[in-house]
Amino acid sequence: MKIISEGETKLMVPEESTLSKKDTVFYNPMMETNRDISVSVVQSFLDNFNRDEFLMCDPLGGSGARGIRYANELKFNGDLKVSIGDINPSAVKMIKENLKLNELENVEVFHEDANVLLSKNFKIFNVVDLDPFGSPVPYLDSGIRASLTKGGLLCMTATDTAVLCGAYRKTCIRKYNAIPLKGDKELAVRLMIGYAVKMASKYDIGLKPIFSHVTDHYARTFMVTERGAGKADSAIENLGYIRQDSEQKSFKSFEEGYEKGYTGPFYLGEISDNDIVQNSLETAKNRNYSKRAVDILELISKESKIEQVGCFDIHELCSFIKKLVPPVNDIMKNLKENGFKVSRVHYNPYGLKTDAELSDLVVLISEYHSKKY
């Protein structure tokens, strides 16, 4: 074992980790950025929380890194309590050691299956964070029911992004009841949110995303729970299907029904709230969290202001129109000079969000080449 630091927290973790289910206790150092962002986003949610008690649950605790960082780093004037669970007795032992290391008394540890822990606490938690190895689907129903408190927050991660991005079409249909679209990584998180919205609606619960990102091998989202059939109906209205023709997307509402050639359903509404993003960015900066977490939050703070589902991949677009790829910064400059909004995206170095149409981009790239060459 070794002791490391993440954020403002000390953690005892395995000396070596294979990052697989074979590990005695699971700890992924590559997810420090994920945890930095998670603490920042939940802090932004907590800043607007107006009750005296704040109850959180991390039912898939592993080494306890996520839940312990919540317990140690979240600032709240009331009573903040965190429940951490894991089915693995070795993990439970390590979680307890990490609690002692940080001298925390606001955490309760459970040696229990995640679904059992969540099902025992129906309508109890203000925040449930599902961070599994693989897909969150096996835990989603229990997570929704456990976070049914008015204005609760459901956080979830999917590390099966190859499935969500279309590499395993049949698996996606089977697990998420949706047809994936290859290419744009943002659609992975939109597909995951769409599935969660459908699952929650059967309990007359609407889910409203307040922050989402796709980083490395995972998709991550934070969704506020809104009670009532009307809220569920409103959430469903944000679902729809996408058809990709060359570089152009066509859309159909969920209510219109599936049509051959389309993919989805995806969540087509806003997936990150500008105020939450900005507050999360300030939190990450003020606490000296990892530079990478700050960089991701800064990009999302810009891209979330542009209403576009997915992005334009300049590399793919130039390949399609048989042009050399200009510097992305030059394209951005030309778009701005022509009155368009534009931003890089956090998940693709060649990706741009813009209110320009595909035809506008083609013209600007062609004009760039005619002037340059």
From Swiss-Prot:
Its protein name is: tRNA (guanine(26)-N(2))-dimethyltransferase
Family according to the record: Belongs to the class I-like SAM-binding methyltransferase superfamily. Trm1 family.
Catalysed conversion reaction: guanosine(26) in tRNA + 2 S-adenosyl-L-methionine = N(2)-dimethylguanosine(26) in tRNA + 2 S-adenosyl-L-homocysteine + 2 H(+)
**GO MF entries:** tRNA (guanine(26)-N2)-dimethyltransferase activity; tRNA binding
Q: Which UniProt keywords apply?
A: Methyltransferase, RNA-binding, S-adenosyl-L-methionine, Transferase, tRNA processing, tRNA-binding
Give residue ranges for domain Trm1 methyltransferase.
2-365
Any one GO BP annotation for this protein? tRNA N2-guanine methylation
Q: What is the role of the protein in this entry?
A: Dimethylates a single guanine residue at position 26 of a number of tRNAs using S-adenosyl-L-methionine as donor of the methyl groups.
The scientific name of the source species is: Methanococcus maripaludis (strain C6 / ATCC BAA-1332)
Q: Which residues of the sequence carry a binding annotation for S-adenosyl-L-methionine?
A: 35, 66, 86, 113-114
- Give the main EC class: transferase
Q: Which InterPro entries match?
A: SAM-dependent_MTases_sf (IPR029063), Trm1 (IPR002905), TRM1_arc_bac (IPR022923), tRNA_met_Trm1_C (IPR042296)
What HAMAP family does the entry give? Answer: tRNA_dimethyltr_TRM1 (MF_00290)
Recorded hits in SUPFAM superfamilies, A to Z, give: S-adenosyl-L-methionine-dependent methyltransferases
Q: What is its EC number?
A: 2.1.1.216
